[in-house]
Every structure is written in C-alpha cells, then in structure tokens.
A protein has these predicted regions:
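Histidine- and acidic-residue-rich, metal-dependent catalytic cores
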Residues: 1-183
Length: 183
C-alpha cells in the first residue's frame, strides 16, 4: 500500500500543479514531496493498512512520521525548504486540528499535498472500509476542504469519471472511459 499510495499521490500532484497555475519547478517540488511524505513509515504502512485498528504505539508512529520523514530527507541531503516543509506539514489542517504540530496556518504546498494524499486514501480500500467511488471521494473532499483551490484542482484534473471507469451512456450502452476530458 505505502509505495503505490505515494506514487498515485505523486501523479495526482503532477496533474494538480499546473491546474493551480504553478510552474514546472514548483510542481516538481510537490511531486517529490508526495513521493517522500511517508518515507519514515513505508516499511510498516502496508501492515498498518492491513490491520484495521491500530495500537497506541502504531498511532504514535503515524503521528510522528511527517517530522521523521523530513528529518530523514535532511540527513539524506535534501535542503529544499519548500519540499521539507510540505513533508513536515502534510497532515496539518489550518486552524490547528492537524498533526503533528497543530499549526494554525499551513504552507500552501503542504495543503496541496494533503489534499492529494486524502483523495487517494479515500479511493483506496482498507481492511475496515471499502474504497469510496471517485464521485463520493470528490464530494467529501470538497466539502471537508471548504472549497480550497487544491481540492477543486484535483477534482477537475482527476475527473469525476477517470480513465478505466465503466459508465452508462444516455443510450443505455456501457462504455469505458479512455481519457480525461477537458474541464
């Protein structure tokens, strides 16, 4: 789960950046943050997803992973502060209800990363729940994000009917979506 989640989140970020009007450099930074946001828990993330209910120790690991991931990246030579801040803050929520620091204000790149992370988590199945449909995930995310531009960008770029979805046409025929449409 951990590696595929990071890859899928990075792909959503790659689509979202230009939709937000970000240049290639800023979008690349967002993608790098998505690929590395969970580096501190990659080895256990799949087990956590398979277990369903977490122990208090496992919850502590989850709460600490943003700062631990950023520290591991620093030790590995990453010095891009936007990248590091996005990783550190990708579970923060404006107003202080996020973790690990309970920040009142959250970096814009971190917010974009969080939206992509949440969206991909919603459409991924877990032991304790089925995956949400793209439509339901988009609706929930947009409502929870209170119209944040990153949520809108994901919905517009990912689409309500992404490639691979089976849809019923007005004629009653079934079809498979083969590409994203212009939105």
């Amino acid at each position: 789960y951990g590696l595929t989640h990071a890859l899928h989140t990075a792909l959503v970020c790659m689509l979202m950046g230009p939709r937000l009007g970000w240049d290639a450099s800023r979008t690349r930074t967002l993608v790098k943050a998505a690929l590395t946001m969970n580096v501190a828990i990659t080895d256990v993330q799949g087990r956590f997803a398979a277990v369903g209910h977490l122990t208090e120790r496992q919850r502590d690991q989850i709460r600490a992973h943003p700062q631990e991931a950023a520290q591991a990246l620093r030790v590995g030579g990453v010095d891009d502060e936007v990248w590091l801040r996005a990783v550190e803050q990708h579970h923060e929520r404006a107003g202080g209800s996020g973790y690990p620091m309970g920040l009142q204000e959250v970096d814009e790149t971190a917010m974009a990363l969080r939206m992509a992370d949440v969206f991909m988590a919603k459409i991924s199945p877990r032991v304790e729940r089925a995956a949400l449909s793209v439509q339901d995930a988009a609706r929930q995310m947009y409502a929870e994000a209170q119209g944040h531009p990153s949520a809108a960008a994901i919905i517009k770029e990912y689409g309500i009917y992404p490639p691979g979805n089976v849809v019923k046409l007005a004629s009653g025929e079934l079809a498979v979506v083969i590409r994203r449409g212009a939105t």
